[in-house]
Design a protein with these regions (language model features):
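The substrate-binding groove and active-site-proximal loops of carbohydrate-active enzymes
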Residues: 103-109, 246
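Short secondary-structure capping/turn micro-motifs that flank functional sites
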Residues: 80-81, 105-106, 141-142, 178-179, ...
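Active-site acidic/histidine proton-transfer and metal-coordination neighborhood
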Residues: 11, 18, 31, 88-91, ...
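Glycine-rich, proline-tolerant flexible connector loops at the mouths of alpha/beta enzymes
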Residues: 73-89
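A cross-domain feature marking catalytic cores of carbohydrate-active enzymes
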Residues: 41-45, 74-76, 98-103, 135-137, ...
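Residue-level detector of anion-binding/catalytic polar loops
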Residues: 70-71, 95, 131, 168, ...
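Histidine-acidic metal/acid-base catalytic patches
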Residues: 2-40, 47-68, 182-201, 205-300
Length: 300
């Protein structure tokens, strides 16, 4: 943060001394800046854990904040949704540094319409301090080469548009993008301008989408480390998603070491979620509290 400048040296000696003394007193009284690692939670995580309790997570924002969560990565589909979510989160002291959205950029007819909608989301998000939009291309198994090329071209255009707003496009992926040798995953990153399209590193989808392979996780990180601006964290035990983020199938010590070598400090977002076989022993707020504490200890 920029520090304010001292009073002009042209002031009288006594006046300057008094002014400096006053400023030092103000600094002493000011609260220390929070240096802890900023940890956000994805809306999918909030929704799935609170759904186990038959509760709408939007009614529990204060509880989520009190659990040690700094922000929520909301899932948004329109400009109006974006503005409404940003206000609700801000009212509860929750940041919206990143948001998540999707769109069909591989289809010739839908492309221009989708670009306009997505650019509006960026415009509406900017006033709330959003720095990253995590973008997952609309899923379609086995996209043709023509569709992949068109999609990457449109993502370049979208990323350039968001960049003008000071927002980074971070490519997000699931198992679909890793099918057929990962041709979609790799073409998005090889077929776009690194200044326009960056990466949300999905360590557990890299793992699961590659046949539960840690080799793939760390190869993906090594290949595209210069593009990573966001990281979604999820863990599993014996290939079933665990209730909290902690020790498990993916080596977090190695992951933390890799993330600390990134050229840019990545935005950390918890994306832990329950699935069939996930234990149910904790209330959602406790899941978030334990996960955030672990992440700060391991990755901070």
């Amino acid at each position: 943060m920029k520090r304010r400048q001292f009073l002009s040296a042209a002031l009288a000696t006594t006046g300057a001394a008094l002014a400096a003394e006053t400023l030092l007193a103000q600094e002493a009284q000011a609260p220390a800046e929070d240096k802890r690692l900023h940890v956000a939670v994805n809306q999918y995580t909030c929704d799935t854990f609170y759904r186990r309790e038959n509760v709408d997570f939007w009614t529990r924002l204060a509880e989520i904040k009190n659990a040690g969560v700094d922000g929520i990565e909301a899932t948004l589909g329109s400009g109006n949704d974006t503005a409404a979510a940003g206000k609700r989160l801000a009212d509860h002291g929750l940041a919206m540094r990143s948001i998540y959205t999707s769109g069909n950029l591989h289809d010739e007819e839908a492309g221009e319409r989708e670009l306009a909608r997505l650019l509006e989301i960026g415009e509406k998000a900017k006033p709330f301090g959003t720095e990253i939009i995590v973008f997952n291309p609309a899923a379609k198994g086995g996209k043709s080469d023509t569709e992949l090329i068109r999609q990457s071209k449109n993502m370049d255009t979208l990323g350039a548009g968001w960049k003008k707003l000071g927002i980074a496009l971070a490519f997000h992926y699931h198992t679909t993008e890793l099918e057929f040798g990962g041709r979609e995953f790799h073409h998005v990153l090889c077929g776009t301008d690194p200044d326009n399209v960056l990466l949300c590193f999905e360590q557990h989808w890299s793992y699961r989408g590659s046949g539960n392979s840690q080799v793939a996780v760390f190869d993906h990180l090594k290949l595209y480390s210069d593009r990573v601006v966001s990281v979604h964290l999820r863990q599993s035990v014996n290939n079933v998603w665990s209730e909290t983020f902690g020790e498990g199938d993916i080596d977090n010590v190695r992951l933390a070491a890799g993330l600390k070598k990134l050229p840019k400090t990545a935005h950390i977002v918890l994306e832990q979620a329950p699935e069939n076989g996930t234990p149910k022993t904790l209330a959602p707020a406790e899941v978030f509290r334990r996960s955030a504490e672990y992440v700060r200890g391991m990755f901070g």
